[in-house]
Curated annotation (Swiss-Prot):
Cofactor binding annotation: Binds 1 FAD per subunit.
Taxonomic superkingdom: Bacteria
Pfam families: Pyr_redox_2
UniProt protein name: Ferredoxin--NADP reductase
Organism of derivation: Lactococcus lactis subsp. lactis (strain IL1403)
């Protein structure tokens, strides 16, 4: 069985960039991803949504970000295994064995970039919700804006996703109604201002009451007042429930299910590192840009701490490519 320098678990943005950086430093690297396509949440949940907070990219869609990361990754030698679910990670005599539902691979180090784990959307909470979702009446994320062209759309939620999607939908939908159960939104102030100055119709503090064919009824919180209007589609942005899977015995996790990391992004198991939304430490910020830096930090720490049987390259790309 071939022994690698590094196995990365998770092919989201942080995992893809980590693989590139590891390869740039001269490590032999493989990435294992349970999904059939790489890219994580940006590719699989919101490929057409614009992302604004990545340095040097004023705005980029989830799909384009994935495309760029894969083009970057193509510059270095690597193996990418898709559609494989990691079952366990074991360490024996300083070497990790990573077992999936298809194979077992060995490496000197492991980097977990599994994001927030398996994601399950929070539901609207109505009786026939599953039927409406199967009919396409209710969605929890958007993979194609074309589905909403010329439609009357109601967006439920009060965070950044609900605000961002309302602005995106405004460009293609006939009407967009944003419904939030509170008077104040939880999103970034600048995004809230953009929504308030757009053609999005904001209804606060309202919640779902009833849906009969295309007639949506909202009920005002702590009031008998109601509101009715016609809709074709409902987008629910109440966030996601996560199901973090503990992949290694004795791996320390925080109360929110993320892997505890030290200042070098190493877990309590020597040689097992973590980066991105899968990690937790004091002052942690769950941002993609932060995850990129965490991955670099982890790999640099790994190159100093672990023993490799071949020389490594320096950390500046301008001296390599």
């Amino acid at each position: 069985m071939q022994e690698l320098d590094l196995i990365i678990v998770g092919a989201g943005p942080v995992g893809l960039y980590a693989a590139f950086y590891a390869g740039m430093r001269g490590l032999s690297v493989a990435i294992i991803e349970s999904a059939q396509v790489p890219g994580g949440q940006p590719q699989n949940l919101y490929p057409e949504k614009l992302i604004y907070d990545i340095a040097g990219l004023p705005a980029v869609t989830g799909a384009d970000l994935t495309k760029n990361l894969l083009e970057q990754l193509a510059q270095i030698s690597h193996r990418l295994f898709l559609g494989e679910s990691v079952q366990k990670i074991e360490k024996e005599e300083g070497i990790f064995s990573v077992t999936t539902d298809k194979s077992t691979r060995r490496a000197k180090g492991v980097l977990l970039t599994t994001g927030a784990g398996l994601l399950k959307p929070r539901k609207l909470g109505i009786d026939n919700e599953e039927t409406l979702a199967n009919e396409g009446k209710i969605s929890y994320f958007i993979t194609s804006l074309k589905e909403f062209e010329g439609k009357n759309v109601a967006v439920f939620g009060g965070g950044d996703s609900a605000l961002d999607w309302s602005l995106m939908l405004e460009k293609v939908a006939k009407n967009v109604h944003l419904v939030h159960r509170r008077t104040a939104f939880r999103g970034h102030e600048i995004t809230v201002d953009r929504v308030m100055n757009s053609n999005v119709q904001v209804h606060t503090p309202y919640t779902f009451s009833n849906l009969i064919e295309n007639e949506l009824e909202l009920k005002k919180i702590k009031s008998e007042e109601s509101l009715n209007f016609s809709i074709d589609k409902i987008l629910v942005n109440y966030g996601f429930l996560t199901n973090q899977v503990t992949l290694a015995e004795n791996l320390e996790v925080s109360r929110n299910g993320r892997v505890k990391a030290d200042s070098m992004m190493q877990s309590n198991i020597e040689g097992l590192y973590v980066a991105g939304d899968a990690s937790d430490y004091p002052g942690k910020m769950p941002l993609m840009s932060v995850g990129f830096g965490e991955a670099v930090h982890a790999i640099n720490a790994m190159t100093k701490k672990l023993e490799f049987d071949h020389p490594l390259r320096g950390g500046h790309s301008s001296s390599i490519f």
